[in-house]
A protein has these predicted regions:
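Luminal/periplasmic acceptor-recognition loop/helix of membrane-associated glycosyltransferases
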Residues: 17-57
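A short acidic, often aromatic-flanked loop/helix-cap motif at beta-alpha or helix-coil junctions
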Residues: 6-7, 25-27, 83-86
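Conserved small/polar residues in nucleotide/adenosyl-binding loops
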Residues: 1-5
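Flexible, solvent-exposed extracytoplasmic
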Residues: 20, 54-211
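Surface-exposed beta-strand edges and their flanking turn/coil or helix-capping segments
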Residues: 13, 27, 33, 99-102, ...
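Short acidic/polar micro-motifs at solvent-exposed secondary-structure junctions
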Residues: 6-19
Length: 211
């Protein structure tokens, strides 16, 4: 297993991936991933900013992480080497699948800087399930916040201030840095946390964050 070098690692090493850099990247795919909250630009898009829900939609069967992930009923540890860890996603949709015809008229894809709402709308139309994700906190003007989760859950943060480019997440004293948020990947995977954990979110400016 190789450490990530570029967005074209998949082409380099010969495996399919959701990430790519190409001068001929189709704008439709770029726009779609952007609406879901993933990193995107004029000639590139990537898995950054994805959730377990979008991983399922895009048939992402394996996730390479540079940190150990908590045990989950959604994915299994598969392999690890030299600080890189491979996880198998247990629940993925096929590459092609049917959707409700109502999606053309009812799917909300223009929710500014909130791919979570777009994902909720997608699942509601196609499955009838409301609020796959539920908002539990809102921090409008804070540059740094500290909270203890009120329940055990897998949590994500959505950073809506377009001027905020770097956020650190500190869980029980261990810090993770997320940068390049101005590329559109404004969903931060906090991970699975419990009521015993301490979580600190800190941005390089006010975050206008939802959790």
């Amino acid at each position: 297993m190789y450490k990530r070098q570029t967005k074209n690692d998949a082409a380099w090493h010969g495996y399919p991936s959701i990430s790519t850099f190409s001068s001929t990247a189709p704008s439709g795919i770029t726009d779609l991933l952007g609406s879901f909250g993933c990193e995107h630009s004029m000639n590139a898009y990537s898995y950054h900013g994805s959730t377990l829900a979008t991983a399922s939609i895009f048939n992402v069967k394996y996730i390479i992480s540079n940190k150990l992930l908590p045990e989950s009923n959604l994915f299994n540890f598969y392999y690890g080497s030299d600080g890189e860890f491979l996880y198998e996603n247990k629940y993925t949709l096929p590459v092609g699948f049917m959707v409700d015809s109502a999606i053309e008229d009812r799917w909300i894809t223009n929710s500014p800087y909130n791919g979570i709402e777009v994902q909720n709308s997608f699942y509601k139309i196609n499955t009838g399930i409301e609020d796959v994700f539920e908002q539990v906190y809102e921090f409008r003007t804070d540059t740094e916040v500290n909270f203890t989760p009120y329940t055990n859950a897998h949590m994500y943060a959505v950073v809506r201030n377009v001027n905020c480019d770097t956020v650190t997440v500190t869980i029980n004293g261990k810090m993770y840095t997320y940068s390049g948020l101005k590329n559109g990947n404004r969903i931060i995977d906090i991970g699975y946390v419990t009521t015993e954990d301490s979580v600190i979110l800190a941005g390089d400016t006010s975050m206008n964050a939802l959790v």
